[in-house]
Amino acid sequence: MSDNWIVQNLENALKTWNDKLSEIWQLITQSPEQFKGGTIWNVIVDIHGAVQAIGLALLVLFFVVGVMKTCGSFAEVKKPEHALKLFIRFALAKGVVTYGLELMMALFNIVQGLISTIMNAAGFGSAAQTVLPQEIVTAVEDCGFFESIPLWAVTLIGGLFITILSFIMIMSVYGRFFRLYLYTAIAPVPLSTFAGEPSQNVGKSFIKSYAAVCLEGAIIVLACIIFSLFADSPPAVDPNAAPVSMVWSYIGELVFNMLVLVGAVKMADRVVREMMGL
C-alpha cells in the first residue's frame, strides 16, 4: 500500500467495498443452516416446532370453518364425494404443516441450485475486485502539499460515499436472511390455512412470498455479476488532467456504478415481486 494518506484513504474505502462484495458472494451461496455457524437456525427450528402445535390447532379450526362455509347442510358432508374431498384436503393440509420445514428447505435448495447455475454459466467463482488505477496513485503521490489539499476533501467525500454504499448493500443481504428466518419460524400458522377453502389464499400468498425472498438471491447474484463486468473495465483516467480532476472524475464514475449495484440489490425484492405478480 502507498505511504500517501490520500491514496491510503481511497484504497481503504475500496478494500471495504471489496470485502463487503466478497461477503455478499459468500452469504448468497450459504444456506440458513450454515449462516453464522447454524446457531440462529437451531433456535429458529425450535421455535418452528413450538409454533407447529399452534398450527395444528388452527388447522382444525380452519377446516371446520371451511366445512361450514362450503357445505350448505350436514347432508352434503355425508355424501361420499364430499367426504372424500374434505378428507384429502385435511390430510394434505396436515402434511404441509407437519413437513412445512422440509418443504420450505426443498424450495430454498431449488433456488440455490438456480444461483449456482447462474454463477457457473457466467464463469464467476467470486466477485471481481475494484482496484485503484496506478495512474491516479502516481498523480496523487507527485502532488505537493498545497496541491493535495483539495484532494483531501475529494477523497474524504468519495471514501465516505463508498463506505456507506458498502454497508447499505450488505444490510440488504443480511435482511434477506432475517426474512428467511422469520418465514421459517412462523410458517405453521399461515400453512394451516390450507385446511379451509375460504382461507387457503393466505397459505398461497405465504408460499409465493417465501419463494420471492428465496429468489432475491438470484437477482442479487445477477446484479453482482453485472457490476463485476463493469469493474473489469474501470472508469477511464485521463493522465494529462489535473490530479483533482482525475480523482474527482474517477470517484464520480465509480460511485455511479456502485449506486447502480446497490440500487439493484435494494430493489431485488421489488423486482421479484413484479415478476411473480405479487
Residue spans for each PLM region:
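Hydrophobic transmembrane alpha-helix segments characteristic of membrane transport
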Residues: 58-94, 186-200
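Alpha-helical transmembrane segments
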Residues: 191-208, 240, 271-275
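Hydrophobic alpha-helical transmembrane segments
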Residues: 53-65, 157, 161-163, 180
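Short amphipathic alpha-helical coupling elements at transmembrane boundaries
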Residues: 23-26, 82-89, 109, 116, ...
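Alpha-helical membrane-interface segments at transmembrane helix boundaries
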Residues: 44-52, 84-88, 92, 141, ...
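Alpha-helical transmembrane segments and their helix-start/interface "positive-inside/aromatic belt" motifs
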Residues: 2-10, 80-100, 203-213, 268
